[in-house]
Amino acid sequence: MTKPIRVRYAPSPTGLLHIGNARTALFNYLFARHHGGTFLIRIEDTDRKRHVEDGERSQLENLRWLGIDWDESPETHENYRQSERLDIYQKYVDQLLAEGKAYKSYVTEEELAAERERQEAAGETPRYINEYLGMSEDEKTAYIAEREAAGIVPTVRLAVNEAGIYKWNDIVKGEIEFEGGNIGGDWVIQKRDGYPTYNFAVVIDDYLMKISHVIRGDDHIANTPKQLMVYEALGWEAPEFGHMTLIINSETGKKLSKRDTNTLQFIEDYRRKGYMPEAVFNFIGLLGWNPGGEEEIFSREQFIQLFDENRLSKSPAAFDQKKMDWMSNEYIKNADLETIFNLAKPFLEEAGRLTDKAEKLVELYKPQMSSADEIVGLTDLFFSDFPELTAEEKEVMAGETVPTVLNALKEKLEAMTDEDFQPDNIFPQIKAVQKETGIKGKNLFMPIRIAVSGEMHGPELPNTIYLLGREKSIQHIDNMLKSL
């Protein structure tokens, strides 16, 4: 690559950081870091109606949590918010007006809506038809004077070359081409309030900030020909474009929607539930890209080293919440206890469970956790009433050898001193029950687990019995024997 690599993530501060936008930021970050380039953040806040208070801070805070850093942003550079660049946009609007490449349009929203309705009723493709079409210069002057006298504030429209062909070699999709006559006619580059439209402002910003590559979602493909028109009108060289495929719900096969309640789609959700940021980074990094091979767990440094824009997928990326949770569990299992305990602490504290055994409980359930908030549900056994058994569990407990096993273990636990009551000493007692009764395997361990914990599966049995405590374990076994 000959020119310096400069890429950007340019969010609108209209709400929380969505997984799709996080992927856009991440892939731009990886592209820049892999090629030794510059990654910048620009805030596109020209849509004042959708502006959310604190939206910018939320975006940056969540990116930082993910482990994404940047070289330039509104925090360190002036005029990196579009709302601070209105004078810059005006300069280029005026230039295009002076060169006859743009013009003021006085058609009202009501007139546009009526024309669109007429076109749809006639089976025509909706498009703007130049309001000055067929007017002489005198008629045009009179029309403008009449509109201005009526207090109508004009927009500014780019004069589209309808015979033009607008094409680019997309980094992801390959050759893409649009005809100038198929984009809906002359389009607005400056709104009535003086703010630029997205497709105009983004070109000015990208050019002046020397952006070399624009990598974004393929919902922007239809914007690209309009942006190429602005580059052409201003005589500027366009950057390279790459449009990543949509993210779809793996269960429905449809575009990821906020209505998909079975998925966590905002980075804030993962923070709130106590996921490890490294796991979320890893998962997002594989949504529409992979380095080849079977490996799925990569560090940030490995992602940077391996990232290759030529391996961005042409097929939609499937968002699978179960896969995310599996990956998160892998990270939690392999993390040190202190890290996970600190992650779980707020949830234990809120539930009133930050006892002297809290760290040991986290250690016990760490292999089962996908997020730190799960520690509360996992430890219900130690703080709540004994759960109601399922039909399958009741069937196990109806076995003819169950009373023999439970009575034998109860005697062993009663005989243990407080000093002896440690995980390392509890397992030999279970083995002694096996030796004395001749009962082994599932017929031995399953009744004990269900009697003690009320569940068929869980962490290591000796640790569960130890953390439950000798008296409570005996009480649970006793209650189970009475219910048989």
Curated annotation (Swiss-Prot):
- Reaction catalysed by this enzyme: tRNA(Glu) + L-glutamate + ATP = L-glutamyl-tRNA(Glu) + AMP + diphosphate
Q: Which Gene3D superfamilies match?
A: 1.10.10.350, HUPs
Q: What class of enzyme is it?
A: ligase
Q: Which GO terms describe its molecular function?
A: ATP binding; glutamate-tRNA ligase activity; tRNA binding; zinc ion binding
In chain numbering, where does the motif 'KMSKS' region fall?
255-259
Where ATP binds, per the record, is at K258
One example of a Gene Ontology biological process annotation: glutamyl-tRNA aminoacylation
The residue numbers the entry assigns to motif 'HIGH' region are 11-21
Task: State where it is primarily located.
Answer: cytoplasm
Checking SUPFAM superfamilies in the record gives: An anticodon-binding domain of class I aminoacyl-tRNA synthetases, Nucleotidylyl transferase
The protein's UniProt keywords, in alphabetical order, are: Aminoacyl-tRNA synthetase, ATP-binding, Cytoplasm, Ligase, Nucleotide-binding, Protein biosynthesis
Compartments it resides in: Cytoplasm
Q: Per the UniProt record, which EC number(s) apply here? A: 6.1.1.17
Q: What does this protein do?
A: Catalyzes the attachment of glutamate to tRNA(Glu) in a two-step reaction: glutamate is first activated by ATP to form Glu-AMP and then transferred to the acceptor end of tRNA(Glu).
Q: Give the quaternary structure.
A: Monomer.
- Name of protein: Glutamate--tRNA ligase
